[in-house]
Amino acid sequence: MPVPILLVTGFLGAGKTTVVNHLLAHAEGRRIAAVVNDFGAINIDAELIAGASDGVVSLSNGCICCSLEGDLLRTLALLLRRDPQPEVIVIETSGVADPLDIVRNLMDPIIWREAPLETVLCVVDATVPVAMLDDALLRSQEIGRAHV
């Protein structure tokens, strides 16, 4: 049975890790695997995930939209081989990621068959106008392409 993927995106400090923590805290018995990407050498976001366990996989020192895309696909393949298999895979992107590139990578036919991308959730800090961000065009596109 396919395992749906929820892709959580958003700019730096928008609250992505808070959203992932909320999902994990309210899993109600569902097996949720979380893949957390942090651009830095130390994955601070993975350390902040409440109750971080073997259900949380850290990908750091690069971005899953480009330099770590192969690592992401390998990680997903490993998660799908676990017994018991997760019921949902949540991927938290780094704040500098271009989600369009990640979506393209997740459309790999082998991955898609076993773990289709179900939802792209873009977390936005409503107190920070998008126009004030250094990469306003990218962030506007990110918001526009999200399902939620």
Features from the language model and the residues they span:
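Nucleotide-state-sensitive switch-loop elements of NTP-binding domains
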Residues: 2-9, 14, 18-138
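Conserved small/polar residues in nucleotide/adenosyl-binding loops
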Residues: 146-148
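A short, aliphatic-rich alpha-helical micro-motif
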Residues: 83, 143-144
